[in-house]
Amino acid sequence: KHHDGFSLWPSKYSTHTVRESKWLNGKGDVVKMLSEACKKAGIEMGVYISPWDRNHPDYGTPKYNEVYIQTMKELLTGYGKFFELWWDGANGEGPNGKTQVYDFKRFQDSALAYQPHLMIFSDIGPHIRWIGNEQGIINETNWNLLDTAGFKRGAGGPPTDSLNRGNYNGKAWIPGEADVSIRKGWFYHEEEDKTVKSGKQLFDLYLKNVGRGGNFLLNVPPNRQGLFAPADSTALMDFKKIKDAAFKNNLFKNARILRTNNSIEVHLKEAVEINAIQLMEAISMGQRVVTFEISGGNDVKKFEIFAKGTTIGHKRIITFTTQKLKYFRIKITESKATPIISEVSGYLFAN
């Protein structure tokens, strides 16, 4: 349900739903069909339920908060397991010209009572945070920590810089999720078909969100036939091909690995062409790395620095000019505690 209040399931708490449409003679239920399809494909499902409702007559009154809770209950108890509930802070006028004072505490408590393992996204989490823009780009320094005390969802949220970077000593573990649309807008319009991002552009965005320790939320709007438009589908398949090819061959797979408290050396049998290195922290032990540098060479006694970075987190993908090297050293130059690097891998991305 987006801000217009139109429910893609036949809600008992609205008269602005698929039930009132001509689609399938009012017998359709998009959420049910999606739930069944996700279950069949083994895909977990998330749900967006906008608190803002530009149609409901109770919006802007105390009654509406209860309506919203019952709306959530319908979805969260009637359509199987959801892994994520997505909230933004939109709070405009309803049909009566009034705005709503959302009772987010009740909303959150109710949602977690219906599905205790649900992850909730918003400006302040509590589980996943917005990254402060809708371009899909996370800062190169990205802490999974965030201070939320004194802030609220929407206009009273944390500063954009904090959302994009996290907080070095944040009190809560709230990783970032980067949202962006595959085309100019969030909904399908035929005249925007030429604005669809290419597979290469999507891969570049992947490097700037997942490759910076975040999560990637890509909006792909269906057309009026309920299908992804050919341009969108082609871009998605191209993105998959590029991504699969990029990570197909781990150049460090059979390397000799030498570890110290603050460094990892990778020794290969022969020099390889390389332009990307992926690092991962064991984040079950927390996010520890503050800064690092990567050096390499073809003499085990002579290393030259060719890349530097800040945070790592779940995943950090560093790209650089293609070089032919045999030896590599990843040195943690600053960390909060003993760094625990769970993976180091190397790749040659196509130009």
How should each PLM-predicted stretch be described?
Residues 1-298, 306-310, 314-320, 331-343, ...:
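Mature catalytic domains of secreted/periplasmic carbohydrate-active enzymes
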Residues 323-325:
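Extracellular Ig-like/FN3 beta-sandwich strand-entry sites
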